[in-house]
């Protein structure tokens, strides 16, 4: 498929490729073909040094995370896998979200696990001000989490 070729060729020229499967699914019905999914996944797994899987606490995202984690357990993957939980809410409910996330991904023995909090106030302020998180709220939880990940990745 042309999309798989594009991704494979791009992988030689860039450090990161981010693919939103939700957008791909709805943008081109022909991409729902199982052969395309298999070719796509095989191509990504062959060239990726690091594979980051993003998931939110939402039901659809949690289901997809369980499915992909199960599929990965049956495959040989060259790169390191990092799982990232996004939109974790603070407090007891957030602890429950994180616990569910960890119960799904921990058996896979990933390279790293990351958690990004839900920080609507900071994101809304940055959006409204058309600024970056650092400028809108330098002490926000999301900005601090992103800074910690960036620091870890650059050391």
Where are these regions (language model features)?
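C-terminal alpha-helix
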Residues: 145-155
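Conserved catalytic-core segment of NTP-binding enzymes
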Residues: 5, 9-111
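C-terminal interaction surface of TIR/SEFIR-family domains
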Residues: 139-141
